[in-house]
Regions:
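Electropositive, gly/pro-rich neighborhoods at or near active sites that engage anionic ligands
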Residues: 1-150
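Short, hydrophobic beta-strand segments that form beta-sheet elements in well-ordered domains
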Residues: 143-147, 162-167, 199-200, 218-223
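Histidine/lysine/aspartate-rich catalytic loop segments that bind and position anionic ligands
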Residues: 148-182
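Short, acidic/turn-prone active-site loops that include or flank metal/cofactor-
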Residues: 167-171, 186-188, 223-228, 243
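An anion/phosphate-binding loop that grips the pyrophosphate of nucleotide cofactors and donors
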Residues: 195
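A short SAM/SAH-binding and catalytic strip from SAM-dependent methyltransferases
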Residues: 201-205
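C-terminal functional extensions of proteins
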Residues: 208-243
């Protein structure tokens, strides 16, 4: 059973425990309807994947909770909570539907925070916070960095960390970005084995590649995508300026 399948069962139990009507509507809007300005505002850098269309932000609303999740498969979904609890988790789009809904539900229950992406100058502030956080909690580790989060990569590189970065975007692979070489995501497992710690986008949980990071090293997830899953499964997570 995958982590998301287990989460689906747990979410069904949460719904039952709260006596929710299984026919209650969940509205999900893909980031095609969230402009880059709505999703991330006007950050100081222009190389975020949200700004160049390589990733999109899916947003789910349940009652007063709003949850977001990155995906590379945008689309629309409108259905009931029961539909989400029984959705087949066989594509990145459907997994993103489930994860963003989980985030919205957990936020509605006030069981998690930072389920909405930071905006404007906040991504830069987040990145500036990261090196000190790593030093305080892990010293000066070798870091496998999964996903292209340019401000974070730049901050860690400038701070002198031994860093190996992987990405799935062919436009980045083999290039020097943010002062460091960008490797193919097919090397995730090798880099996780090499590193002392892994810093990973929560998108690996949506695209179902998280298992390759399990190399006996601490895995710390960053960002909004993993908000609900981190709370549900006690996964280490950082999201300094999420809303």
């Amino acid at each position: 059973m995958s982590l998301l399948e287990e989460a689906q069962i747990k979410l069904a139990n949460i719904a039952a425990d709260n006596g929710w009507n299984k026919h209650e509507k969940v509205l999900i809007v893909s980031a095609r309807d969230l402009t880059p300005d709505e999703a991330i505002g006007k950050p100081e850098r222009d190389d975020y994947p949200l700004l160049n269309g390589k990733e999109v932000m899916m947003e789910s609303r349940f009652r007063d909770g709003v949850g977001q999740a990155f995906t590379d498969q945008p689309g629309r979904f409108e259905g009931t909570l029961d539909d989400v609890l029984h959705i087949s988790l066989d594509t990145n789009f459907r997994r993103a539907v489930f994860v963003s809904t989980l985030n919205a539900v957990m936020r509605s229950l006030k069981q998690t925070e930072a389920t909405i992406h930071c905006k404007d100058k906040e991504p830069a502030f987040c990145a500036q916070t990261l090196p000190q956080y790593i030093r305080e909690h892990h010293g000066q580790p070798k870091i496998a960095f999964i996903g292209f989060q340019p401000a974070m990569i730049q901050a860690l590189n400038d701070a002198g960390f031994d860093l190996r970065v992987t990405d799935a975007n062919p436009d980045n692979i083999g290039q020097i970005r943010c002062g460091t070489h960008i490797y193919d995501a097919s090397l995730n497992a090798d880099h996780a084995h090499w590193a002392d710690i892994v810093l990973s986008t929560g998108s690996v949980l949506v695209n179902n590649t998280y298992r390759e990071l399990q190399q006996g090293k601490p895995v710390i997830y960053y960002g909004v995508t993993v908000a609900g899953l981190a709370q549900m499964f006690s996964l280490p997570r950082i999201c300094f300026y999420g809303r």
